[in-house]
Amino acid sequence: RTGQPIMVLFDLLSRRWAMGILWNLSNGPCSFRELQARCGSASPTVLNTRLKELREVDLVEKTTGGYALSETGRDLFKRLEPLGDWAMKWVPTL
């Protein structure tokens, strides 16, 4: 780790299924099984590990409805969403 906050964030988000979890939770809470179905090929071990990591940094929280984005997670997602829009325009140019 470099100690730079942006690099710490990129390190976390680049881990397998971290972005997929955030993206899938952006539509509302999911149980573990629902999230696993939405993430398709994510193993239960990887999904559990990633959820634990995302909870430890307050991006995801456990609720009565399952897992959900925390307030911090929703704020991050709002900032990432324009990147998704940009990527949709960029991909066809490849």
Model-assigned labels for residue ranges:
Residues 1-5, 23, 78-94:
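Amphipathic alpha-helical dimerization/coiled-coil segments
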Residues 2-46, 52, 57-61, 68-74:
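N-terminal helix-turn-helix DNA-binding core of bacterial DNA-binding proteins
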Residues 49, 61, 90-94:
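Short, polar/charged, Gly/Pro-enriched helix-capping and turn/loop motifs at alpha-helix termini
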